[in-house]
Amino acid sequence: MLSTLAKRFASGKKDRMVVFFGPPGVGKGTQAKLLEKEFNLYQISTGDALRAEIRGQTPLGKRVKGIIESGGLVDDDTIMDILQACMQKNTDNNGYIFDGIPRTIGQVEKLDALLAKMGTPLTHVLYLSVNIDELRERVCGRLFHPGSGRVYHKVTNPPKKPMTDDITGEPLIIRKDDTPEVFNQRMNQYFGTFQPCIDYYSKKGILQTFPVDGQPIDVVHKKLHAALQ
């Protein structure tokens, strides 16, 4: 897989290789989708990829289901396998946004090694920081439409009809990993692993931090867009 991917990369320059860094639920996915269209990038969300495996009841999905739903971290090798598979399938772009990876220093090192072999090192690391109490309220109020991936919020972006998708009329769900108990577990995991990642990218001079507390999506987006210009 690696040699095939390297050959595909050699045929087209990747202008932007971007890591979106920050705790689960901070808004990385929302911002990534906006920037994806504007810069012809491809968003790779390891969280979405893992949940797709779970929905498909694949061997991998069955193996990681309990880990994801309890707020744990999937092992680094599995995450990197998923990342490479996503890159292999999507090469017609100007670069990638890595959303949800890296989350450990081991993943940082593996990602650097992979991209070095591709000849396409990271160009930007965008760190979205947020007050944890605000984040808890944001995450534990989320509602999802499984078929499309549309996201609502009980308070800030409610559906027109309670627990019902505005477009299809199908029921919305609350993910099992969006309960207060699992949120606390995920935050414990996150804060136990993220500081070495922050330090690593800071020393490389490619880390940019964007506080997002109380800021509208469009305000944050303008700042991120400017950072990638």
UniProtKB/Swiss-Prot annotation:
Q: Name one GO molecular function term.
A: adenylate kinase activity
Question: Which annotated residues bind AMP?
Answer: T46, R51, G72, L73, V74, G100, I101, P102, R103, Q107, R175, R186
Spell out the subcellular localization from the entry: Hydrogenosome
> Is Transport given among the entry's keywords?
no
Q: What is its EC number?
A: 2.7.4.3
Q: Which reaction does it catalyse?
A: AMP + ATP = 2 ADP
Record's keyword terms, sorted: ATP-binding, Hydrogenosome, Kinase, Nucleotide-binding, Transferase
Q: Output the Pfam families linked to this UniProt entry.
A: ADK, ADK_lid
State the Gene3D superfamilies in the record.
P-loop containing nucleotide triphosphate hydrolases
Residues of the propeptide region, as annotated, are: 1-9
Identify the stretch(es) annotated as LID. 141-178
Q: Where does ATP bind?
A: G25, V26, G27, K28, G29, T30, R142, G214
Q: What is the annotated role of this protein in its UniProt record? A: Catalyzes the reversible transfer of the terminal phosphate group between ATP and AMP. Plays an important role in cellular energy homeostasis and in adenine nucleotide metabolism.
Family affiliation:
Belongs to the adenylate kinase family.
Protein name per its UniProtKB record: Adenylate kinase
Q: What is the lineage of its organism?
A: Eukaryota, Metamonada, Parabasalia, Trichomonadida, Trichomonadidae
